[in-house]
Amino acid sequence: MLGVEMYPGLALGPQRLSDCYYRDRDVPLYPSTCEMAARALPPALLKPHANTDSPATPQDSVRMELENAGLWKQFSTVGTEMIVTKKGRRMFPQLRVKLSGLNPSLRYILLLDIVPVDSSRYRFQDNSWQVVGGAEARLPDRVFIHPDSPATGEHWQNRTISFHRAKLTNNTLDAQGYIILHSLHRYQPRVHVIEARDVLMWGRTQHSFTFPETQFITVTAYQNNKITELKINSNPFAKGFRENGMNCKKQREARLKRKITSSQEECLDIESCDPCDSTELLPQSVDLPSSALTIMNTALPITDSGFHTEVSSHPDQTDSDQTLVLEQAFLTSEMPSSMESQQQTTSETNVNNALMDETGQMMDLSGYTSSFPTPQLSSHTSVPQSSSMYSVVSSTQSSDLELPQASSISSPHSMPAYSSIPSAEYPGVNSSTAMPASTTSLSDSYPSISHSTSSHLLQSSSYHSLLPTDQSQDNLSPHTPTNPPFQSIPACQGTRLTIDSGQNQVDDGGLSSANATTPAVPNPTQTAFPFPPVQPNNDPDPTSPSCQSLPQSALPYQQVSQCNQIPTPSDPNTTPTAFPFPPSEQSTPNSIMVSSNPNTTAFPFPPVQQQLNLSTSGPSSFPVSQSSGLNAIPNPVHPTTGSFSFPSTSAIHQGPMQSVPNTLHPSTAYTFPSSLPKHTGPLPNPAPTSYPFPTPIPPGPHPLQSLTLPSSCSIPNTSQIQSTFPQSYHNPSFSHIPPQMANHSQITSQSFPPLQTSSAPQLLSQSSTHPQCPPPSNAYPAVAPTEIGTFPQLNSAAPYLPDVVLHPSILPSLDPSLSSSAPPSLYNPFPSYSLRLCQDPRSSLHLPLRHIYRQPQHAHGQGSYFDLGGRTVF
């Protein structure tokens, strides 16, 4: 049972070396080197050691007392029960004894064993333990050795000896050394005191002590409630179960109730808490890097209607002027304090009415009716050139997708409000309700230059019209130094391009006077606006009087932001505006000298990666998003040679953009969307405007077809307009377009469904708007017209005014128009485009609009953009 190997420190008596021989002396606890050497020698063989050395004190002198006898007696009167478990359970009450009469110099070992009292099995019934049968087979006896053993008699006598560490188990296969007992049997603990040297000796006596009050019955659960109460009250470790303890029944129930309540509250909190959505609008004055803007545009989830799910739509948009304060994230790194969003009245119709319900793919459908505060002199709204040319396209994800009806497309009743509004309050991107990606493709590469006005513009649209206000308009360019030599044109302040939905009239200059009734706009100042990928013919045919000043917006959206475009009548000379595109990475502040004297206002359009510094004094730069056409660029009646340098799509020009001046025949006229209202009065003195576009277009004069733009009412239909454009661009930069298709009319026969402005039924049919526009040679792929035009939601139910011809046949089905103008080879794979459109914008965003989010810095040609699933996209 006890071996020396278990306790190497035990000083044993004479050890038996063989049957009859013992070592003559005890083995020292720590033998010395000499002893070890002597031990190597053969030991002296002696007869068995005679047991003559009896203990110094008589055997009966050793006494043991049960220290906690009172507690044991208290339990024994009721009937002590001890819990046994598979894992082992300590005893309570504990065995606490006190020894006396030991030899202080001798070492002793204390052992505990538990033996059955009888051979019966018990059951607790009728509040007493009764014998119910014979005992189970006796288990091998196990002994618990006190941890202090071996210890001298002095050690044991000077302290209370407790066997509290002994554990009882009913696991017959226990390997932990616990005492194995049967449940429902009666047992008696015993304590043995043995001299350490006598452990292995025969015939030596040991002292065993038993206490009748320590008998107990083993149970797996307390049977007698009195025992339970005694144990709870007596056991310091069970005080939690007492009446005033933490584990009492009352406390347990209370804790359980609190736990259930807290869990329910947590569930409610989880349900009620607002979701952490990255789509939430960024606070104003947030400096968005171009990459962040791109990510935001691409990653934001789009709801079915293409709006932020988080965005709360203004519930009651009524005729009454409602102040709409948009907390739109500004794309500007620096926002002057004056750029706080101003209240602006919105037209009665809701954005939801104008916007397509399920066309979430039309990223830039919505314009904001946000009033733009007057730009400060040194207001530098540095519009980061988002690396993704289409970061602006996801404008619909902006919080309140309100078509900027107030200024750009102001319903007749709303016009008066704007008549008095300073030019700075022109919502940019007003009419760009649903810009095809093609129109908005440039917006990202050429961040629309928005002064403070950009605050309310859709981020993705980034259509920031530079609308000078009554304030000194010297620095209109977001990046221009605080004191650039810009002369403000005060007279233009009241004027703003407004599409009177009621009248369906857009002032020819695209600029309606504050009353929008100005019969004749004298010399419209050539306003510079970033040119969208589609470059329409620069000059309207001088012969077309009514259309002479039609805004050269092939864009379906009339830019309202064109305030100050009409120089005061006193300005006999229209200021020619040259739009040089600065090389990428260069932000060139453009000092636009707009004065009575014609000043060429150079609008450098930086390639992608550049911050556009459009400083338009009077004229407000039009968001590039309206790339499909030069929006509201008053095309002087006089022929103007405009050199269009188209940026090569494949490469971003790090150096200055090579602009191969393409001389435009003076006769070239910009086709205006049929929906555009005819200009009330001809502009007497159009100023020649040169539009240098980055050149992917091969050098060489491109004879822009001298298109005589009839008044909007006279514009019969897009087919007519397209036919009128004989312009053939040599070697179009589009890889997917065969050279024979370079003819502009062929390529741009795309019919875009008219986007109905939220305020009025006026529809700007993009098909008429864009057909004349040459396919953008810029590296900004336009959204395939097929993806836009085929949305039935885009077709507004509002009828065209009599002066505008609606072509229902073109709107519902693009094939006939496409086949007539464009080679069928382009569209053969997809006879029905509407079928390919997914109603769920999320699922369809990846492929159809993938090109919108592509980075413009790609080194490869445009082919990758346009070859989307076998579908050619312009």
UniProtKB/Swiss-Prot annotation:
Disruption phenotype: Morpholino knockdown of the protein results in a complete inhibition of the segmentation of the presomitic mesoderm. GO terms for biological process: anterior/posterior pattern specification; blood vessel morphogenesis; cell fate specification; morphogenesis of embryonic epithelium; positive regulation of DNA-templated transcription; regulation of skeletal muscle tissue development; regulation of transcription by RNA polymerase II; somatic motor neuron differentiation. Residues 367-380, 429-442, 468-480, 495-528, 536-551, 584-614, 664-674, 720-734, 742-771 have a biased composition (Polar residues). InterPro entries: p53-like_TF_DNA-bd_sf (IPR008967), T-box_DNA-bd (IPR046360), T-box_sf (IPR036960), TF_T-box (IPR001699), TF_T-box_CS (IPR018186). GO terms for cellular component: chromatin; nucleus. Residues 683-695 have a biased composition (Pro residues). Residues 71-243 bind DNA. Coiled coil: none annotated. Residues 364-396, 428-453, 466-551, 563-626, 664-695, 720-776 are annotated as: Disordered. This is T-box transcription factor TBX6.
